[in-house]
UniProtKB/Swiss-Prot annotation:
GO molecular function per UniProt: single-stranded telomeric DNA binding; transcription elongation factor activity; translation elongation factor binding
CDD domains per record: Ten1_OBF
Lineage, highest ranks first: Eukaryota, Fungi, Dikarya, Ascomycota, Saccharomycotina
Subcellular location as annotated: Nucleus; Chromosome, Telomere
Gene: TEN1
Record-level GO cellular component terms: chromosome, telomeric region; CST complex
Organism this protein belongs to: Saccharomyces cerevisiae (strain ATCC 204508 / S288c) (Baker's yeast)
UniProt KW keywords: Chromosome, Nucleus, Telomere
Protein's name in the database: Telomere length regulation protein TEN1
One GO term of the biological process aspect: telomere capping
Function: Has a role in telomere length regulation and telomere end protection. Acts as an inhibitor of telomerase loading through its interaction with CDC13.
Subunit organization: Interacts with CDC13 and STN1.
Length: 160
């Protein structure tokens, strides 16, 4: 099951903390073996900012075609409203959505991402597994739900 995360800053902090602990960044003796970390899945509802197409050979070798830049939704009263994040996307996934006229800057997306770690203490990679373009009604219903007592309960269970 994916964890629903509403604030990109919290997601970055959660992943960074997990990465630092597993790699013994704080006070490690440097003699620890490299660990292959389990991947994690998250669901985020965000606003599309732009696409950046990959140019480096390393990104292409890893199977990435572009990065989707996303930003927190303002309706969720996030203290980090301007927080942005770059998510890698495969060419297959980009091609499946590129002709959709609703995929424009500012559009709200329901995105499932996988976070995976390389070996040799490389930083985590955020990759889009799938995404859906949300309608205005979907966004309104989502914002009302997460602000409700039932939504708060759901978020607590999802993130425990």
């Amino acid at each position: 099951m994916s964890q629903l995360v509403l604030d990109l800053k919290c997601l970055k902090d959660k992943i960074a903390t997990n990465y630092d602990i597993h790699n013994n960044v704080y006070g490690g003796n440097g003699m620890e073996p490299n660990i292959i970390h389990p991947s994690k899945r998250f669901r985020i509802v965000v606003r599309l900012v732009d696409f950046l197409f990959c140019k480096s050979d390393e990104e292409f070798i890893k199977g990435f075609f572009c990065q989707m830049i996303v930003r927190n939704l303002h309706c969720l009263n996030s203290t980090n409203g301007a927080e942005e994040m770059r998510l890698y996307m495969s060419e297959r996934l980009f091609s499946a959505h590129k002709d959709d006229l609703r995929l424009i800057n500012g559009q709200v997306l329901d995105v499932r991402i996988g976070v995976w770690y390389g070996i040799h203490q490389s930083p985590p990679i955020f990759e889009i597994i799938d995404f859906k373009i949300l309608s205005r009604n979907d966004v309104r219903d989502f914002c009302e739900f997460v602000k409700s007592p039932l939504g708060e309960k759901f978020l607590n269970i999802s993130n425990s």
